[in-house]
């Protein structure tokens, strides 16, 4: 039985307050807030599947629509002939084609060694007339701009990696960054100039606290010794003196 329905349970009959009509909007608002918060927290890393659902692009690309046989009637003959050829001959042909593609004619070394001056003169002659050198500064500028645009992307990716995966409510980014920073440990052999200022202050503070604690313990010990010396031995006839009072009366 939902609160909005007209049917009332025994609990609703007995406890009439609070009224549903008054507090229904508040309840629904809180429900919506909880749902939105859950969605925010769970949407930090969505898992994208390659083949999700029957109508995915991978399925559509993998299985194209079958074409009619009449349209593909003419090229069917060469394909049948290719199938008749043995597999070994096809493999040999493919290997020969790959070798021909990979092997390129190397330039003769003698020509390159004998004519370095000719190349230099050609480059100097073609510099003012050819459009190639004029385009080089623009290409360099374009490369510089690409590098400049890539650098902020890398920095943003680093920032995203350092961020907490969940959206923490009530916490700012500065506090999160402060929490992820490393602390500076102080070695006894390190000089004052090599230590971070905050770590040096913390070290001095701890040393002062240790001295205070040592002084307090010494004072308490001396007070206990003085009390033990002053206290007179209690008589064993006192019925109200317990063993605890007899042993620990100096601290009371």
Swiss-Prot record:
Gene Ontology annotations for the cellular component aspect, listed alphabetically: axon; axoneme; centriole; centrosome; ciliary basal body; ciliary transition zone; cilium; mitotic spindle
Pfam families hit by this protein: CCSAP
Biased composition (Low complexity): 54-64
Intracellular or extracellular location(s): Cytoplasm, Cytoskeleton, Microtubule organizing center, Centrosome, Centriole; Cytoplasm, Cytoskeleton, Spindle; Cytoplasm, Cytoskeleton; Cytoplasm, Cytoskeleton, Cilium basal body
Function: Plays a role in microtubule (MT) stabilization and this stabilization involves the maintenance of NUMA1 at the spindle poles. Colocalizes with polyglutamylated MTs to promote MT stabilization and regulate bipolar spindle formation in mitosis. Binding of CCSAP to centrosomes and the spindle around centrosomes during mitosis inhibits MT depolymerization, thereby stabilizing the mitotic spindle. May play a role in embryonic development. May be required for proper cilia beating.
Subunit structure: Associates with microtubules; the association occurs on polyglutamylated tubulin.
Protein name: Centriole, cilia and spindle-associated protein
């Amino acid at each position: 039985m939902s609160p909005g329905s007209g049917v009332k349970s025994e609990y609703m009959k007995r406890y009439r307050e609070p009224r549903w009509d008054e507090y229904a909007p508040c309840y629904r608002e809180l429900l919506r807030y909880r749902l939105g918060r859950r969605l925010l927290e769970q949407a930090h890393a969505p898992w994208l599947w390659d083949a999700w659902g029957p109508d995915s692009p991978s399925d559509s690309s993998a299985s194209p629509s079958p074409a009619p046989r009449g349209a593909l009637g003419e090229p069917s003959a060469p394909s049948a002939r290719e199938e008749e050829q043995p597999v070994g001959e096809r493999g040999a042909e493919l290997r020969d084609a790959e070798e021909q593609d990979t092997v390129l004619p190397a330039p003769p070394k003698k020509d390159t060694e004998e004519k370095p001056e000719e190349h230099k003169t050609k480059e100097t002659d073609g510099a003012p007339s050819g459009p190639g050198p004029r385009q080089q500064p623009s290409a360099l500028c374009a490369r510089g701009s690409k590098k400049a645009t890539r650098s902020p992307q890398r920095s943003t990716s680093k920032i995203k990696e350092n961020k907490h995966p969940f959206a923490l409510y009530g916490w700012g980014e500065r506090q999160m960054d402060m929490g992820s920073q490393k602390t500076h440990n102080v070695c006894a052999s390190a000089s004052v100039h090599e230590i971070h200022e905050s770590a040096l202050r913390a070290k001095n503070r701890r040393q002062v606290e240790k001295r205070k604690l040592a002084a307090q313990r010494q004072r308490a010990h001396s007070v206990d010794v003085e009390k033990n010396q002053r206290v007179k031995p209690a008589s064993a006839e006192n019925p109200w003196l317990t063993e605890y009072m007899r042993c620990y009366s100096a601290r009371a």
